[in-house]
């Protein structure tokens, strides 16, 4: 998934959800080419009986101005699992919205080196020795 001129979060609108809510974000590649204040995930249900969140084996990358952007906003989380998530070297947001241990691990390579053709939206992993490739992180479509 790549975001270009996105003005809302990638996942949002959970405010009116009721009952048990399970959200799993797994084996995805997210590349933000969006405005500076982009939010990746706005997960704020108000009336759920339980909210279980799993975020694992994802790759996050893109362009974000210093001091801008949010990774997660969450509310009323019953349980959460964050594991094996990575971000390309140099990709940061102002507000990760999670505990320090849950922030994605920074890769050795920046997106321009890790991906085949960022401008052409070809996010094939070019370095077969990179931690992203060897650990199978992100969308399997880009790990060839």
Where are these regions (language model features)?
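Extracellular beta-rich repeat passengers
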Residues: 1-121, 143-144
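Active-site and glycan-interaction determinants of carbohydrate-active enzymes
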Residues: 125-144
